[in-house]
Amino acid sequence: HGFLAFNEIHPDYYQIPVADREAIMAEAPSAEDEDHDDHVRDSDDGESEGGLADEERLKRRLMRRYKIQDVIKRRQILLVQVVKDERGAKGAALTTWLSLAGRYCVLMPNTGKGGGISRKITNTSDRRRLKAAASALKVPKGMGLIIRTAGAKRTKAEIKRDYEYLLRLWETIRE
């Protein structure tokens, strides 16, 4: 058994009026997975702390109208990922905000925002090179990609190969 918190449910699964779901999805901030030290939002993407707080407030206000029982229904099928293992009597912590970790990249298939380069990569030339490599990959809309610390000294071809592997893995999971 596991525990799925309300804020860990992706809006695609919401069984609510379409207009409300679209409003929530339009304002949903990126889901950052704090369990991975390697992937974080790139600091130069132009979004301020205040902007994130406003988005979070709007999302909370829209979601406050609903109880979790209204949003997902009994026996509804959800694709979840374990983010924290079961411990004692507590069940595992689950999320529908998925992340697939490869050798050099982390693919977040249902996170439209987010992505970039690991914060642990501090060398400016490496960051610039990796940012160019990431933008050349043409990540589909609705997905996020983070280049991990292990990818810092890797070539564009190695990063692309890892990214393509993660995309194939995601397609296999979806089938």
Residues covered by each model-derived region:
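Single-stranded RNA-binding surfaces
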Residues: 1-175
